[in-house]
Regions:
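Solvent-exposed coil/turn segments that connect beta secondary-structure elements
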Residues: 92-94, 120, 130, 204, ...
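An extracytoplasmic/periplasmic, membrane-proximal ligand-sensing/linker region
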Residues: 26-28, 170-172, 257-318
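N-terminal secretory signal peptides and thylakoid transit peptides that target proteins
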Residues: 1-14
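Immediate post-signal peptide segment of exported/extracytoplasmic ligand-binding proteins
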Residues: 17-31, 80-85, 140-150, 210-211, ...
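N-terminal (or domain-start) structured segment
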Residues: 20-109, 157, 174-200, 208, ...
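C-terminal lobe and pocket-closing loops
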Residues: 205-272, 301-304
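Hinge/capping helix and adjacent helix->loop/strand transition within the periplasmic-binding protein
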Residues: 78-85, 99-182, 186, 234, ...
């Protein structure tokens, strides 16, 4: 079970938020989810429902997948001034993809107002149950011996799964064939159909591992996944890499601070609601609460780190 930190518990309000200004919210709030429906992305649908109850107004989840999770943030960045009725998930790719483009669609530090940091993902590599590979070491050895012959699905070019696999390939002399898709449900279907040899993704694959359809070979966290304690981490197999792709919610630039506070104060108890905590736990997603000020500072550091990584690896998308 995910156990929130003492600081986070003390920060959790005991009552519904005081609204920032008269009349807010005065219509449904759109929550942009930059992934396909299904799997791990659906925790945001539950969060929207719980936050809407706190606000006394419907929060409508809206899936806008594409461009490795950056189509949704691009829609938010287009708004010249936020009024609180449009928010969305900002995945780590929103810091990475702009650094890979000559003409990025948005500036992650100029075009968003940071509302609340939520969590991260548990990544891993899965194969079908009938795959000849029973361990990660076997798969990696085959990729080394057969460069470019082992294909893997990811949720998109520039995604955390893609970047990590390319780093593994480069550092271990094991070139893989990358096949990008739009999200977790697509990557799972690709593996089910035999279109790829394996999938590198966050825990959208959990139900299919639990029912025996897929086999989990390795996870990418600092420690073993709670749900799969028998599965080793990359570090345990000799690869010094940890990836968990932290994320939160943001509003458009220039959103009134009072509106940001009202949104935050509705989302914070929703984040810690036992029903939402149970869903995070189901997908091995860590609780990583940060308020607006702390999240803004974290986003600035993340933007610097991701830009440096892109330059170091020479990654381009145009």
């Amino acid at each position: 079970m995910i156990r929130p930190t003492r600081r986070a518990l003390l920060a959790t309000p005991l009552a519904a938020p005081a609204l920032a200004q008269s009349g807010f919210p005065n219509r449904p709030i759109r929550l942009i989810i930059p992934w396909l429906p299904g799997g791990v992305a659906d925790h945001l649908r539950l969060l929207a429902d719980l936050a809407g109850q706190n606000l006394g107004q419907t929060v409508v989840p809206e899936n806008r997948p594409g461009v490795s999770g950056t189509l949704g943030p691009a829609l938010i960045a287009q708004e010249p001034r936020g009024d609180g009725h449009l928010i969305g998930q900002i995945p780590i790719t929103a810091f990475r993809i702009p650094a890979m483009l000559r003409r990025p669609p948005f500036d992650p530090m100029a075009d968003f107002t940071w509302v609340i940091h939520l969590s991260g993902y548990c990544f891993g590599v899965v194969v079908r149950q009938d795959s000849p590979f029973t361990t990660w070491e076997e798969l990696l050895a085959h990729a080394k011996a057969n460069p470019g012959r082992i294909s893997y699905a990811s949720p998109g070019s520039g995604s955390s799964a893609h970047i990590a696999m390319e780093r593994i390939a480069e550092e271990n002399g094991a070139p893989f064939l990358h096949v990008p898709y739009r999200g977790g449900s697509d990557t799972a279907q690709a593996l089910l159909s035999g279109a790829v040899d394996c999938t590198a993704d966050s825990t959208s694959w959990v139900p299919l591992v639990r029912d025996g359809t897929f086999r989990l070979l390795v996870t990418w966290g600092a420690g073993r996944a709670r749900s799969f304690p028998e599965v080793p981490t990359l570090r345990e197999t000799g690869i010094d890499l940890v990836s968990d792709s932290p994320f939160g919610l943001a509003a458009p630039k220039n959103t009134d601070p009072g509106v940001v506070r009202a949104l935050h104060d509705a989302l914070r108890p929703a984040l810690f609601d036992p029903r939402h905590v149970e869903m995070l736990d189901r997908f091995d997603m860590p609780m990583r609460y940060m308020g607006p000020e702390e999240y803004t500072a974290f986003a600035r550091r993340l933007n610097e780190e991701e830009g440096a990584a892109v330059r170091r690896l020479g990654l381009r998308m145009d």
